[in-house]
Amino acid sequence: EIGVRLVGSEMCIRDRIMDKPWLADHIKNGHGPLCAAYPQEYTSEGDTPSFMPLIRNGLEQHTDYTLGGWGGRPEYKNGNHMQDGNDLKNGVPDSHYTFQRWLPAIQNDWAARADWCVADEYSKANHQPVARILGESVRTVRPGEKIILDASPSFDPDKNSLSYQWWQYREAGSVQTKVAIKHVDEKRAEIIVPDNPGKQLHLILELTDNGTPNLKSYKRVILNVN
């Protein structure tokens, strides 16, 4: 079940990828008896973010929910209590955007898994690309150092074409200033480490294939500025 609590502008996303026609086409109809049994007799409530970090998509949120990922980006408040953080949506803090930003990728992933239920050959369904980088994913770096981000080991098991996107996950790290990334949409990108000693910078490789549906995988690079 993909059940999420949507409010305000998020309903626009639901109209496209979470309404009954989408579920009928991509999940319930023609995808075997298990998918056909998916009920639509209630309002999606929001337990899904608790489960989504268990899907190994490269964001490593299963190791620490506060890293942010398909399960949103919860923060500890008042001891052990957790609540949604605020990710920036068009420059404005929005606690709902911590999960909303991932919805298209989540829904496509679900649709692909439904296709697996009825594909009698591996080649008749799409599968997630594999995001890999050269070097360590957690590094200690110095201010002013040039860092090469190389995703050339990445591949797609279906031989689909891949698109690369590097971006700074500002809310997950403690470096809040925007860091310039050169060659942001290429396999090999680079940055200059900002002058923020004692801070942590999170960079995400977002890898997208051109299969049907488009599927994404990720690789998180954490730079600890010394």
Model-identified regions with their sequence ranges:
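Proline-centered linker/hinge motifs at extracellular inter-domain junctions
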Residues: Y122-S137, L162
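Single conserved hydrophobic/aromatic residue that forms the stacking wall/gate
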Residues: E1-I13
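Exposed beta-strand face motif in extracellular beta-rich ectodomains
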Residues: K199-L203
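Short, solvent-exposed loop/turn segments at the edges of extracellular beta-sandwich modules
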Residues: T208-N214
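Low-complexity "stalk/linker" and mucin-like segments enriched in Ser/Thr/Pro/Ala/Gly
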Residues: A131-V138, Q168-P194
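Extracellular and select intracellular beta-sandwich modules with Ser/Thr-enriched
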Residues: N214-V221
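Short, solvent-exposed loop/linker segments at the N-terminal edge
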Residues: R139-E145
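Acidic, Ser/Thr
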Residues: D150-D158, W167-Y169
